[in-house]
From Swiss-Prot:
Gene3D superfamilies: Rho GTPase activation protein, Winged helix-like DNA-binding domain superfamily/Winged helix DNA-binding domain. This is DEP domain-containing protein 1B. It comes from Gallus gallus. The keyword tRNA-binding does not apply. Keywords: GTPase activation. GO terms for molecular function: GTPase activator activity. One of its GO terms (biological process) is positive regulation of Wnt signaling pathway. PROSITE patterns: RHOGAP. PANTHER family: DEP DOMAIN-CONTAINING, DEP DOMAIN-CONTAINING PROTEIN 1B.
Amino acid sequence: MEPGLVGPGPYRATRLWNEIIELFRAGMPLRKHRCRFKSYERCFKASEAVDCLHELLGSNQNFGPEVTRSQTVKLLKKFLKNHVIEDIKGRWGKEDFQDDGHLYRFPPSSPLKPYPKKPSFGKEVIKFPDWDDPKAGTSQEHIPVKSIMMNSETWYKRHSIAIGEVPACKLVFRRELTQENIEEIWKSMTLARLQKVLGLDCLDEVIDTKLVNSKHIVQNAYNVNKQGIVTLEDKSKDLPHWILSAMKCLANWPICSDLKQPTYSGFERDVFKTIVDYFGQMKEPLLTFNFFDVFVSVLGLLQKHNEAIEALQISCLLLPPESRRKLQLLVRMMARISFNKDLPPLSESVRTRVLMVQAFSRCILCSKDEMDLDELLAAKLVSFLMDNYQEILSVPSSLKSSIEEHVVHVQRVQIKYAGADTDAAFPAPSFCHQISTDEFEYQRATGSQEPLAALLEEIATNKEISVKDKKKKLKQFQKSYPEVYRVRFPTPETEAVLFPEKSKQKPPLLMWALRKPFQPFHRTRSFRM
């Protein structure tokens, strides 16, 4: 079986789990083995399973070569617990798999997981705020937005069409947007952009949009320092000072401005262990349980580098500010430690980069329901984060500028000319909303019939075409759209009105004969009756 990239979408973790099982069952060699004077057909050693699965994961573009052998052993333990494999005596259900010579086999039953039935998020379409009717009690403070300035030359070009003939005009001021209005615009446009980047028809299966806090998005976009790190209004939610000092010490090693210089061997390892213990005891990962499916879906875009970075930029913008700040500081420290050649090794057996991924993956990404591929998925995401953290953890400039321009457009003063309708000259932005299936079918029927009825009326009242052509066109229309035709011409009498019969009276025979001159050698008709 040829492994393929599992793209973004709902149930991506379950799809990956099933794909790995299928690849493992198809690629694992089965042979005859002997154990304690007995022969067993179609089985394999534990060490052989580790070798095979490790190679499959390393060559699979959904996981990559950074998967370690220990992670492979942990996954095989999950396989044994979930009855993907069993020992030669048919035992399973425990995670007692070891990288040794014990014999295992595949059970005859299907080990694939069914796709979970997630509760519907209501498929509620995000509504843009009605800024004409602000709610009482909302703050009038507005977020700083980019002002659009026009010099005199630009203004002249825009308004120079027959300047001498421009009628009287007046300025129409839009009501100022409230803080809540602008926050809802940020939320709506951010989620719309995320949906487009992920290539999904709907975000309902990967995120509950009701759980997205519009205030968090705005705070993450504007409350940042010179380094792009989020600043918190509530300092009690920040990292403790001693953890910040420890992180700065390792990130800037050997320059430790906040701590005294180490006085004993292994000092840096103790500092690192302190940081690991602090982040390990958190009740919720930094990417939060609510957004687990979103980030797992983004993993399907890693082959498309630019799209993956933009999707992660937007997804990280949805985080609570305190989680985003901790993530920024932690990933920046991890990246600096990985590339710091002056820092002594923090482990005897594991490379520093691998150690960073193993130590902090779980506190960055994991699911609430303890899924079986959590560790591998988190390791893949954290590795990508470390390599591109400066771009991913910055505010997406294109999204920010487009939202700011939209807000300015809504707030901009409009010019209304005499006799003109302001809304017709400067149409306000219109937005879509979801409708029911019955309403859609009704709109599809009526919406297509109106232009057809107009076309039929045009044919019927057109005096420039001949009667023959008109009848031909009407007959073709009746054949193609009988329902529309029946509405306009319910009876033959209504159709006959278009073609009044002309009286065809023959001229008197005498007058006809007299009009022609008498010609010799031709018989003329007798005038006698």
